[in-house]
A protein has these predicted regions:
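Conserved active-site and SAM-binding loop architecture
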Residues: 1-103
């Protein structure tokens, strides 16, 4: 199975995928420290930084399992709940990536 992740963090999904014998094709994480962790542990996986600037069409039909958790701050009761007015409102970018990848 081929796995890829969006909003990857430090790679919990990648570790689980590896434990199941899956191949980690790519990860996408904007924060520098988590991205460095991912690059260290998964050097054969392509690394993307900014989901808003990444074209995923090259992965169309090549990913079996796509994982990811888009930022929840725009909706969180702990925050200001600005929804689409929050610059962290990235659900539309995740949907675009899903459509391009078509897992």
């Amino acid at each position: 199975m081929n796995h890829a992740s969006l909003f990857s963090g430090i790679g919990g999904a990648e570790v689980a995928a590896s434990m199941m014998g899956w191949q980690n094709l790519f990860h996408c994480e904007i924060q520098e420290f988590p991205r460095k962790v991912l690059q260290y542990w998964f050097p054969n996986s392509e690394s993307y930084e900014d989901i808003t600037k990444t074209d995923f069409t090259k992965w169309h039909g090549k990913v079996d399992v796509l994982t990811g958790g888009f930022p929840c701050q725009p909706f969180s009761v702990a925050g200001r709940r600005k929804g689409a007015d929050d610059n962290r409102y990235l659900w539309p970018q995740m949907l675009r990536a899903i459509r391009q990848i078509h897992p």
